[in-house]
């Protein structure tokens, strides 16, 4: 089950580019440099989620490394999106991962049925879940099932990338009526101050 990089027929061994014998991924360092210093690899050829936006971020980072600039991709801040109905989007850690890592945490959820825009448009299926560190309140993960999830996750990516707290999201003024208010309400639920949650 899943996908694997198709590297075995590329002649990489003959070129001297090392691959992982089990996964087929090209072995790279933190700069995306392969075992041949003038060859770089990104995207589906290297470990990590096989997503176009992850490959784009790695391509930019590799170019920055080649130019001698600092380069980094925060793999914890790469969104995953499933284009189904309803849409599914997530970034950061899941509640199961947080539990397995024994990290103290709090969660807040909010149903789209409580968002005025969702009700007006008849798109009330799903909810938003915010997972925050139990002591620092730093956002650890955001998960959305529902309308516009693919677009809404961008705010969650920013929160994870820049170490925002659930309070930061809760205190950010969101337009009304919007689907994004459900994210604000979920963050407010972490803070136990949701306005519309029952």
Ranges and model annotations:
Residues 1-66, 159:
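FAD-site-proximal beta/loop scaffold in flavoenzymes
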Residues 4, 18-20, 69-79, 103-108:
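A short alpha-helix-loop-beta-strand transition element characteristic
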Residues 30-32, 73, 80, 120:
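Short secondary-structure boundary/capping segments
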Residues 34-38, 74-76, 134-136:
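Short, flexible turn/loop "capping" segments at secondary-structure junctions
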Residues 43-47, 80, 168:
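Short beta-alpha connecting loops at secondary-structure transitions
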Residues 48-56, 64-97:
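Rossmann-like dinucleotide-binding cores of NAD(P)H-dependent redox enzymes
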Residues 67, 83-94, 99-198:
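Flexible, glycine-rich terminal cap/loop adjacent to redox cofactors
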